[in-house]
Amino acid sequence: MTEPVWLNAADIYSIHKKIISVSGGKPGILDGGRIASSLNKAKNVFYYSENSDIFNLAAVYGYGFVKNHCFMDGNKRVGLMVVYTFLGINGWELIASNNDVVKVFSELAASQGSQAMEIETLAQWIRENTRPI
């Protein structure tokens, strides 16, 4: 697989700002280090893991931003939009229904499973709910 187009911290801040302005919530960053960690984890998986297709990388991003609680509010929404944006800039479109998206990201936020299991579950769901642009 060729190296994907990555998101950066400015992209994440922009996504969060837009989410809060459109759908409400408390603005603010809880921990900038968690944002960097969530961004770097996907790159680490790409460079050092055999399981690094675009869907798994999107799931790593989604998991990181949902579970790391980087922001005061909007973490699930940021996680979803990071997945959507990352897929989009790499030639894929998430086509799941709004109800499915809400269910999957709410379940992810509440999950107590292992990180590896949750990422694989999310990656499989993304794989089944995308199409090339």
Where are each of the predicted segments found?
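FIC/Doc superfamily catalytic core
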Residues: 1-133
